């Protein structure tokens, strides 16, 4: 009887709680006038559910189609779909990052991306900025070339020495190459991932991100006995932490032994000084930044490269334009550098921009919050409301983009709209907290793709499930399915990310 009474009381409490949530959401909330899916008004777990089920991108597009330029995604979180509104928020220090960014912190130590205090964030950015400018990138470029396109060419050329044509998986190969680049730059060590087809480091990154997310949203799973549920994720996390600690110790020992300083990101972190006190970062701060760079940089860059290749294989007219551009500007035996690609390959750059527009690195941004009220699209948004950007919608927004569903790289070559189109791109964020690794990512993407299309003929395999003639209801080539991880990634890369390579045809 006592148990039945207790259960009845429990259900009554839950019913009262539900009634309160409904009444507050529909009649009392200061955001009740803003359009929203019903579940978004009563629970904050809707975006998390979409993320965990891989439906984040689909939901982002559907919500924009249904609710328009502004809507609620959680009871106290507004999503913006107009890139102009997003830029208003992202360009102001008045809108600070929320604690949600702490998901990506190592042991609670902030990194350049997770500081919520604008002053602290700017101080760290001033520490690191000299090492992400073009001059320092030029010093690091030999490492990018060695472990990137040169390693890829060595792998592919070895296969082409035995066969006239070879099928390669461009997702796996470029992914491994990006890990080798990041390992060399961030940890000063060789992963040999591409050479040995070693996916251990890929596992480290994806499992570490998953562990950070799970630990943030469900902290109780770290406690016994539930900790066994995440023991595999925790092991990858611990392995990455140990590797980073060891890498820092090795570098410090090399410096104490009088060996010359390499031009890489690990050395940049060790040399970075507080702009005011001139104090260096602590070993744990260096470790936090290095882990963040590996987790945030390698997978996102390699996934963009994969998407560019995918789109160009679907649109032969743009592929032919890129091939013609690279070969008209550079001889076959020349390795194209970043500065050369920036100066001579505008069409390739436009293709990368257009790919980032069609497939943003993430479907949404994490929220900002302001201590002051703001009016956007005629809606009053009170102080304390979280504001995030629906990147998928912002990159399809009308009238910001003409014919937004069309893959059309020349939109980024129009001089009249040159600055506007780039301002509307939110893949690397915008304003005061744009991605500090943006220039490095662009360097790796441009150099890898430029040399690929200069040196090889590429085509789809005969049994590809995607191609120029395999179209959707609108008559456009279907694109391969996506999934959300560190970035927007191909859902089935083993099946869908295959291309046939052959040696460049010379006239």
Curated annotation (Swiss-Prot):
Gene3D superfamilies in the record: Cytochrome P450 (1.10.630.10)
Enzyme class (EC, first level): oxidoreductase
Glycosylation sites noted in the Swiss-Prot or TrEMBL record: 111, 206, 339
EC number(s) reported in the record: 1.-.-.-
Record-level Gene Ontology MF annotations: heme binding; iron ion binding; monooxygenase activity; oxidoreductase activity, acting on paired donors, with incorporation or reduction of molecular oxygen
Biological process (GO), any one: helvolic acid biosynthetic process
Inducing factors: Expression is under the control of the secondary metabolism regulator laeA.
Cofactor(s) required for function per UniProt: heme
Pfam families xrefs: p450
Keywords attached to this entry: Glycoprotein, Iron, Metal-binding, Monooxygenase, Oxidoreductase, Signal
Cleavable signal peptide: 1-25
Associated pathway: Mycotoxin biosynthesis
Binding site for heme: 435
InterPro entries: Cyt_P450, Cyt_P450_E_grp-I, Cyt_P450_sf, Cytochrome_P450_monoxygenase
Membership in a protein family: Belongs to the cytochrome P450 family.
Protein function: Cytochrome P450 monooxygenase; part of the gene cluster that mediates the biosynthesis of helvolic acid, an antibacterial nortriterpenoid. Protostadienol synthase helA cyclizes (3S)-oxidosqualene to (17Z)-protosta-17(20),24-dien-3-beta-ol (protostadienol). The synthesis of protostadienol is followed by several steps of monooxygenation, dehydrogenation, and acyl transfer to yield the final helvolic acid.
Protein name per its UniProtKB record: Cytochrome P450 monooxygenase helB3
Species name: Aspergillus fumigatus (strain ATCC MYA-4609 / CBS 101355 / FGSC A1100 / Af293)
Gene encoding the protein: helB3
